[in-house]
Design a protein with these regions (language model features):
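Extended catalytic core of nucleotide-activated donor transferases of GT-like folds
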Residues: 1-61, 70
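Nucleotide-activated donor-binding/catalytic signature segment of Leloir-type glycosyltransferases, i.e.
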Residues: 33, 178-206
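A short, active-site helix/loop in glycosyltransferases that binds the activated sugar's phosphate group
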Residues: 52-91, 96-108, 183
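Conserved donor-binding/catalytic core segment of Leloir-type glycosyltransferases
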Residues: 123-141, 147-150, 167
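Aromatic "clamp/platform" in nucleotide-sugar-dependent glycosyltransferases that forms part
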Residues: 223
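A charged, aromatic-enriched C-terminal amphipathic alpha-helix characteristic of glycosyltransferases
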Residues: 304-312, 325-357
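C-terminal alpha-helical cap of glycosyltransferases
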Residues: 345-395
Length: 397
């Protein structure tokens, strides 16, 4: 009733929604009534393949699908099939404000305070190399694997060097949706040389920028990840990233084909999680999944769980460590340059411009739905995933 009243009294031009479609099931139930008057725009993302055919009804219920990742755009098109021709489907990646997240150097007006912040963070310890993880403590984010892989990295470089390294985890250390990270730390980490610090309090944006600048690399090794905002924020702060190649994280690594073109996806090449292409942006340390298995639940019956091995993550951390501070800084600034570029469109300004363009296009394309349809009934069509699940092939343009 509230939506009906809002449309009648306020007369909006459109309804814009975002996040998981299951949050909007109640709205999709009345989509015909709404779309006889105004369009529905959806800024959407989906974590992984196989294409979620169980989302088809949701995607059909909107007029504009703004896909946050390249993978999501492909999923929207694959799931909709012939219905896609009636939609506006565009790639609109997340954008970060470069005035909020930026590199801090000696010219920063509060550089002395930044040095004090870093000193307090490590409780007086002399730390030369910092790994940062900023995410929720939930199973798909693999927080325990983060600690295990960091411990393995420390063993790879030796105890004396490891004493001057640190892992910072900005998260709730104990969460029923994840695990008890204090217990994981105690079990895996010898405190004499493995330094793991937790940042559990909510922080303002300016404080988060300080944390990103303390780090040498930000890592995210989720087994399902629609985008991975901490990576984009880290890149905007001029820092390198380490990622599991899945979901929208692979967009941020900017994998390129043999012609140097930023890769795109289709039914024959739905993802790069099988390591079809390995060359990526200088700012990224990419770790490919060692295992792809199917997870699911009644509302979402199937989805790939793309897990990378802690050993591979540890090796990638060692590679970043051995680059040295000057090379890490150069590569991190290359990442910032790219997220600010017209190619990536990952700045807040570029994202806003893309949203405006897409909304304008959708308004031009919008045709109000009729009050009813006459549907000729027949046998239920076979419903199965038609894109490749193995042996991906890439089409060069």
């Amino acid at each position: 009733m509230l939506v009906r009243k809002l449309i009648k009294e306020e007369k909006p031009d459109a309804i814009l929604i975002f996040t998981d479609p299951r949050y909007w099931a109640w709205l999709f139930d009345m989509e015909r009534e709404i779309r006889t008057k105004i369009p529905i725009f959806y800024l959407n993302i989906w974590d992984d393949y196989p294409s979620p055919l169980y989302n088809r009804g949701y995607y059909r219920s909107v007029d504009l699908l703004m896909a946050i990742s390249k993978q999501t755009k492909n999923i929207n098109e694959l799931v909709l099939g012939d219905y896609a021709k009636d939609k506006v489907i565009e790639y609109v990646p997340h954008g970060i404000n470069e005035d909020f997240f930026f590199p801090i150097d000696e010219n920063y007006e509060a550089f002395d305070k930044f040095k004090d912040f870093k000193k307090d963070l490590f409780k007086g310890k002399e730390i030369d190399f910092v790994v940062f993880w900023n995410s929720r403590n939930i199973h798909r984010k693999r927080p325990a694997d983060v600690i295990l892989s960091y411990r393995m990295f420390c063993d790879m470089i030796g105890e004396e060097k490891a004493k001057k390294c640190a892992l910072i985890m900005h998260t709730q250390p104990s969460d029923n949706n994840g695990t008890d990270l204090h217990a994981v730390k105690e079990a895996f980490c010898d405190p004499s040389y493995v330094n793991v610090f937790f940042s559990a309090e909510p922080l303002q944006t300016a404080q988060m920028n300080l944390l990103y600048n303390v780090a040498d690399v930000t890592m995210l090794i989720s087994s399902n990840e629609g985008w991975g905002l901490s990576l984009t924020e880290s890149m905007m702060a001029g820092k390198m990233i380490l990622l599991n190649v899945t979901g929208g994280m692979q967009d941020q690594a900017r994998f390129e084909d043999d012609n140097g073109k930023w890769i795109d996806f289709d039914a024959n090449f739905p993802s790069n999680h099988r390591a079809t292409f390995k060359k990526c942006g200088e700012w990224a340390a990419a770790v490919f999944p060692s295992n792809l298995s199917i997870a699911g639940s009644p509302p979402t019956p199937y989805i790939y769980d793309d897990r990378c091995s802690p050993e591979d993550v540890a090796a990638a951390l060692k590679w970043v460590y051995e680059l040295g501070p000057e090379e890490r800084e150069r590569r991190g600034l290359k990442g910032r340059e790219w997220v600010l570029s017209e190619e990536s469109n990952m700045s807040a300004k570029n994202m806003a411009s893309r949203v405006i363009e897409c909304c304008d296009k959708a308004f031009e394309n919008f045709t109000p739905r009729p009050s009813y349809d006459l549907i000729e009934t027949g046998p239920r069509p076979v419903n199965y995933v038609k894109h490749k699940l193995i042996d991906y092939t890439y089409s060069y343009e």
